[in-house]
Amino acid sequence: MLMSKEDESQMTFSMLPDDLVLNCLARVSKVYYPSLSFVSKKFRSLIASTELQELRSFLGCTSSGLYVCLRFRTNTDYRQICFTLRQKISSSAKILVPISSLDSPFDYRSGVVAVGSDIYAIGGRNLNNSASSKVMVMDCRSHTWREAPSMRVARDDFPSTCVLNGKIYVIGGCKNLDSTNWIEVFDTKTQTWEFLQIPNEEVCRGFNYKIVGYKEAIHVSSLENNRATFMTYEIHKGRWREPHLSLSHGFHFSNCVIENVFYRYSYEMLQWYDSCRKIWKNLKGFVRRSIMNPRGEGVKMVNYGGNIVLLWEECVTIKKKLIWCEEVVIEKKHQGEIWGLLKWSDVVFITDEKNQLVRALAPDV
């Protein structure tokens, strides 16, 4: 039976079967997903579905997206805005653009971490300036927010976070830490919180905590009376131990973990940790960037789909500030050598507003 011209004019893309629409969406760049999510409720639902993510994975269409949080100073307080890295139209240059979402519903003091295609904003402060246990999640496929189960303890003072095997580990953010609130663990699959056992009460007395997930263990550093303390928790053995001293040196610098290798930016050099010889080695082929802070202070480092992305600020004048970004391709050679080859480096953001580069994340998109 032939379709009449009137029927043809009434036929729309949204009337197609879900399987066919998913097949089309899976082949479209995720750069367009936030805009497509406004087409209809059906599109928004399909874009946020696990089926689409699974289909993209099956087709080999997944990639990492770079999200950058900047903190801007206002007359009375701070506001945090999220940007994503996009390529300019008809150009190979890349720029940071604000995400097409409502203002971030989380406080700039929140702990923020990426798991899969989600960005979790953990804790911070409520509107009445009290500590918050709230957890908000942004789906990077549609740039929509939802609420996750709250923590058991309110944390408002920049809690440190890391991800290991689909679980989010949160430490600090409280003024009075003890064995009941030192570390909380969130299982993203079961959506449940639990506390992690601690070795002793003494480790809770520090402040300025940092936590890193590396080689089936979480590594914690803290400061107390200008003295750093380091502890390692082995997940499968369920026990705490002191890490090797050379490994603990990686906590003082910008760092990230890629395929079970610990990398850091230290004194204008990218280095990786040789866990067999217990030493730090320079990444061969990487050219020093003298424009950065020599110690790496303020440099943000992130695992970007198996490569390293570095971001840093350059103050040109009192008002004008640039944000640089560069991507370094990681190549593992025989005999255990690791090379870092510069893929691109450019200014991705220019502003005359007072702001600070807070963090960088690379969720799956």
Curated annotation (Swiss-Prot):
Key words, A-Z: Kelch repeat, Repeat
Q: Does the keyword Heme apply?
A: no
User: Which InterPro entries is this protein grouped with?
Assistant: F-box-like_dom_sf, F-box/kelch-repeat_ARATH, F-box_dom, Kelch-typ_b-propeller, Kelch_1
F-box domain: residues covered: 10-58
- State the Pfam families in the record: F-box (PF00646), Kelch_FKB95 (PF25210)
**Repeats (Kelch): which ranges?**
118-165, 167-213
Q: What is this protein called?
A: Putative F-box/kelch-repeat protein At4g39290
Q: Which organism is it from?
A: Arabidopsis thaliana (Mouse-ear cress)
